[in-house]
Amino acid sequence: MRALAYAAGVAKVVVEVMLKPEIHDPQGEAIAAACQRLGFGQVLGVRQGKRFEVEISGPAGAGEVGQIRALAAELLANPVIEEFSVHAPEPP
């Protein structure tokens, strides 16, 4: 897969998916425990999640971001146990 980059007529929309706060996160707990073992004592907790970078044609206006939000709700996140956010970063 080629790296996502800003090009003429192409935009990127970012979807971040996290477990809901009330859902147990064993992977995050394992990472936090490893941080302690490795000497990173300032780390109190970790929640693990997923990040999707979706490349779309054209600008990432409100309508396009709304379509990606619908995609996230239907395909990228499990609404029973996960919450998500969608945003279009500013091009560099």
Residue spans for each PLM region:
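Non-catalytic terminal accessory/regulatory regions of metabolic enzymes
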Residues: 1-92
